[in-house]
């Protein structure tokens, strides 16, 4: 699933090509046809959500879930995915923006309402970590690993940055939320934010050490084979180092 840093980069790419441009065609016609002739006035990432705003007050709200993505082409350029996978197409004089496979594509009159349920966006320049901590205190998540994926607590963190931020902090993903103090959670959130900020703004694919995707391979820090197990109701695969993130790990580091 694209995480907040990926959506941030996507929004930046769309903003460069669409901001201030007039839509000459929009498909599907039945749902997006009324965007024809409208000017794009903003592109904003909100956690894992993306909003494209128009001068008539409407906004195109998309969420990529597991397999969705936005592509940008020149008119006449061959698409890298089949046309039948397109869920939204916006054309301007020099750009064709195509959203493929997104399960959520909707035109909304109140874009704030569409994302009101989300916690503070971790990549927002005004990220409110204290509000995220207040929301965490009300979360029903049992473990710290599950809490970090709760988008109503903090929007944007996904499984990759969850695993790697916890590893960097030396904290077991199965640590009960009930035994996690605010200082520890603040440190994890700010670590995830910094990792995601570097990822969002780096040229190319940034190389940051971590354990995600390394099940059975050596931990980059201590060499212990990385463990992997499904976690939470969604059974997301969680990667962690039993030595670096076990009892006393913070002291050893």
Segments (PLM) and residue ranges:
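Structured catalytic/nucleic-acid-binding cores of DNA maintenance enzymes
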Residues: 1-253
């Amino acid at each position: 699933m694209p995480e907040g840093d990926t959506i941030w980069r996507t929004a930046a790419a769309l903003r460069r090509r669409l901001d201030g441009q007039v839509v000459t065609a929009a498909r599907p016609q039945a749902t997006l046809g009324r965007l024809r002739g409208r000017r794009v006035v903003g592109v904003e990432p909100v956690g894992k959500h993306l909003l494209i705003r128009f001068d008539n007050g409407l906004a195109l709200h998309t969420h990529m879930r597991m397999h969705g993505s936005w592509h940008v082409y020149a008119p006449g350029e061959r698409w890298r995915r089949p046309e039948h996978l397109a869920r939204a197409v916006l054309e301007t004089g020099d750009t064709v923006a195509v959203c493929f496979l997104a399960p959520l594509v909707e035109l909304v009159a109140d874009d704030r309402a569409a994302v009101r349920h989300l916690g503070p966006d971790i990549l927002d320049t005004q990220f409110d970590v204290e509000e995220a901590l207040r929301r965490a205190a009300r979360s029903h998540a049992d473990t710290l690993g599950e809490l970090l994926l709760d988008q109503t607590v903090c929007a944007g963190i996904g499984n990759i940055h969850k695993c790697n931020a916890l590893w960097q902090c030396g904290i077991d993903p199965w640590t009960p939320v009930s035994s996690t103090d605010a200082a520890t959670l603040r440190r994890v959130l700010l670590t995830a934010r910094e990792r995601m900020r570097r990822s969002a703004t780096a040229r190319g694919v940034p190389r940051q050490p971590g354990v995600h995707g390394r099940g059975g391979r050596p931990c980059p820090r201590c060499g212990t084979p990385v463990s992997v197990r499904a976690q939470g109701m969604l059974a997301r695969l969680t990667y962690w180092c039993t030595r670096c993130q076990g009892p006393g790990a913070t002291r050893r580091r």
